[in-house]
Amino acid sequence: MAMTLRDMDAVRPVNREAVDRHKARMRDEVRAFRLRELRAAQSLTQVQVAALAHIRQSRVSSIENGDIGSAQVNTLRKYVSALGGELDITVRLGDETFTLA
């Protein structure tokens, strides 16, 4: 007889921390993919973006491969500026939202 989802959960409960880590990793990958798309739309290579942003090509690669969370704000600002955009930082606290930078 086939197991139901409820049966499977009873045998092997969901590890909420692992699920949350996976969600965060997937969110970073989606953001990185979008940045790669934006760069490609500008017909720029990673080397060109690095030169325009005055950062290493390896850092551009790292950002575009999902390592956005550990990037410094100034590095992200340079990267986005090299693509012709502006980086905004938004703060959300409860019902209040404002742009920090």
Swiss-Prot record:
Induction comment from the UniProt entry of this chain: Induced in persister cells in response to D-cycloserine.
Pfam families found in the cross-reference section: HTH_3
Tagged with keyword Secreted: no
Cited SMART domains: HTH_XRE
Ranges of residues in domain HTH cro/C1-type: 35-90
InterPro entries recorded: Cro/C1-type_HTH, Lambda_DNA-bd_dom_sf
Residue ranges flagged as DNA-binding region: 46-65
Function: Putative antitoxin component of a type II toxin-antitoxin (TA) system. Its cognate toxin would be HigB2.
Protein name per Swiss-Prot or TrEMBL: Putative antitoxin HigA2
Gene name of the record: higA2
